[in-house]
Every structure is written in C-alpha cells, then in structure tokens.
C-alpha cells in the first residue's frame, strides 16, 4: 500500500492550508462551485416572470418550464457536488487506504465527466430556448438569463478540467502501483512439503533395500 498514492500527500501529516488552496483540483472545483451558484441563482431569482394581466408565473425561456427546471437542477447539484468534493479533497491526505483513495478518484472522474456533458446539453438547450423567446414575454431579468447561459458555457470547460485532473490522478495511482508491485515468486531453495508442518529429510533410504550380512567364510558342521 502506498500512502502517497493517487496524487495526495503522505497520510497522517498535518493539514497544510496553503498547499490545499493551491492544488489544481481545489482551484478548479471552487470555480465550478461559483459558476453553479451564479447559474441557479439567476434562474431562481429572475428566470420566472408574469404578464401584466395575470399573476401566473412562467419561465422566461420561451415559457418552457423544462428549461428552467433543467438549468436549476444541474446548477444546484453541481454546487452541492463541488462542496462535497472540496471536503473530500481536504480529507483525502488523511486516507491511508489506497483502495479507498482509488474509489474516490474514480467517483470524481465519473461525476466530472458526466457534468461536463450535462452542462453542454444545458447550454445548448437554454441558448435554443432563449433564441426563440418572444421579447414581449421578458419584462425583467434579461441580463440574468444571459448570465445563466454564459456561465453554463464556462462550466463546460471548468468541469472538463476537473475530469482531466481526476484522470491524471487515477493514472498516476495505477502507474505507481504497477511500478511498486513485486511478484511473490517462491524461493527455489525452499523444500516443498505436501502437508503443512511436515518435515522434510535431506536423505531418504531407497526402497527395496536390505541389510546384507557379510560372512567370514564357510564353516562345516561339527562331527560327533
């Protein structure tokens, strides 16, 4: 087991705040958290409007409720996930089990790759709905809508960077394991025993041997 596996410091050391804040994945994750906060705040705050003659609220993205729900959902989940993985990054050097580290890095890689794709879909979806929106339906909040679209676009790259960094950490951990792996080959000088605890003699008497008695010569029977 390597205590420094998967791109983390040696387990058991003291927490270094400066080193933690300068780690690439921590910086990228903080950027993702801010972008997600901006997206869902803009949609929640000014993504809904109503006509003068009605109090019924509707989504300003072409009155498509799915557009507002989708943008808000991926924004909230991205914010929560970013906060969670920031805590994991802070606690990661204290994890001495290489298997636990591997699973956390794989989870980070899969989630970051998935959210990169979801942000791309969200950007295309919101841009399309905003392009066909009737300007008369947007009484207020046009700037917030544009901000949500803009930071959805930026989030594609920030989460892509996170996925790339997670892959580099995973690959470094696998390469480190391969380099330090020792094949437990048996010692050829060690005798093999069929049963545990059985003693092995260096010399075994060959089968079917008899101890021959030597005769000094022929002795005739006594004569009476």
Curated annotation (Swiss-Prot):
Q: In what tissue types does this protein appear?
A: Ubiquitous; low expression in brain.
Give the transmembrane region(s): 26-46, 73-93, 105-125, 147-167
Task: Tell me which Gene Ontology terms the entry assigns under biological process.
Answer: regulated exocytosis; synaptic vesicle membrane organization
Predominant subcellular localization, coarse grouping: membrane
Q: How does it sit in the membrane?
A: Multi-pass membrane protein
Stretches assigned to the MARVEL domain: 20-171
Residues annotated as carrying Phosphoserine in the record are 3
Biological role stated in the UniProt entry: May play a role in regulated exocytosis. In neuronal cells, modulates the localization of synaptophysin/SYP into synaptic-like microvesicles and may therefore play a role in the formation and/or the maturation of this vesicles. May also play a role in GLUT4 storage and transport to the plasma membrane. (Microbial infection) May play a role in the assembly of cytoplasmic inclusion bodies required for SFTS phlebovirus replication.
Q: What is this protein called?
A: Synaptogyrin-2
Organism encoding this protein: Homo sapiens (Human)
